[in-house]
From Swiss-Prot:
GO MF term list: ATP binding; glutamate 5-kinase activity; RNA binding
Metabolic or biological pathway: Amino-acid biosynthesis; L-proline biosynthesis; L-glutamate 5-semialdehyde from L-glutamate: step 1/2
Protein name: Glutamate 5-kinase
Any one Pfam family match given in the protein's UniProt record, by short name: AA_kinase
InterPro entries membership: AceGlu_kinase-like_sf, Asp/Glu/Uridylate_kinase, G5K_ProB, Glu/AcGlu_kinase, Glu_5kinase, Glu_5kinase/COase_Synthase, Glutamate_5-kinase_CS, PUA
Binding-site residues, substrate: 62, 149, 161
Main location: cytoplasm
GO biological process: L-proline biosynthetic process
Cited function: Catalyzes the transfer of a phosphate group to glutamate to form L-glutamate 5-phosphate.
GO CC annotation: cytosol
Signal peptide: none
The PUA domain, residue ranges: 285-363
Amino acid sequence: MSTPSQAEVRRMVAAAGTIVVKVGSSSLTQPSGHLDPDKLDALAAALAQIRLMGGRVVLVSSGAIAAGFGPLGFDERPADVATQQATAAVGQGLLMARYETAFGRFGIRVGQILITAEDTIRATQYRNVERTLDRLLDLGVVPIINENDSLASNEIRFGDNDRLSALVANLVRAEALVLLTDVDALYTAPPSQPGSRRVEYVPNVIDALGDIQVSGSGSKVGTGGMVTKLEAARVAAVSGIPTVLTCASNAGPAMMGDPVGTVFAPVKARGSSRRLWIGFAADPRGAIVVDAGAGQAIRGGRASLLATGALEVHGDFSAGDPVWIDAESGEHLARGLAGFDSEEIPQMLGRNTAQLKRFLGPQYAHPLIHRDNLVLV
């Protein structure tokens, strides 16, 4: 597809029938860590206007841990996982209660969906998420999505809601993604540095990633920084979805296509939602190293990974977990969902289908990774 102009991309955003908006913890809280009712109400009002004009709106909202640590007596976000998860369990209810009240003023119902990355890398759970979101939107509900911080493990998790929002945008076939943060736009360097310039338009986020100096986590109450937002914009771009990055106070103008923040152009036509989730939803748990012939077949697309072309297996994973497919050089060729547990694969290495069936049984005469569960990188 040809690269659209900035004005064209902003018109795409303004015309979006379905829009996904992500808001970070720091955009919803006071410096003390408590929820800021005024900020939350202002965001709800902006989203409600889009909904009342006939738009379909999905909100991906951080803030459960930030909402919970104040009421539990902590001065700042807890560092250990167990306390974070307990805090999220308290804070998620407080957060949703505020959203229900805020949207209720406009006669709009909200629905909570808590997701873990592990939920979404298996086909059945993935389809359940897709069906639930579609039905909520059909009913005029604003779905409010968050990673299930109370249950997600550090081993398999999104780690931030930026990436989750981009995946959700593809899942609901959104026409725009809006990332709301505590800065008004992307800058060429941290805004406090002399010479830093605001970037109004990014025609190709993939090419631009190496040209912009960004920092890590942006605040004491959130987990993401500008790096994760650029990654989200990249995921959206390769899904054919334009993205706007700006501060929460610009939510309304951003969704209306006004020249605020930074706008990122899509770089591809929309692809398969399922394959995008495999490619980006969760970090791989291990790797299967393949020989040159298998690598060439994988690169050609639409080829399953057969045991006959596999040389080594690394990591500890279960059937259905995401894994890398690596060349002998260590280059990542693809990501896919393993068809077998890591402990089963060594006995399968180098064997063809007939040998697997004869020596190990018919249950092993299947690909290590089926082509429908494989995505090139």
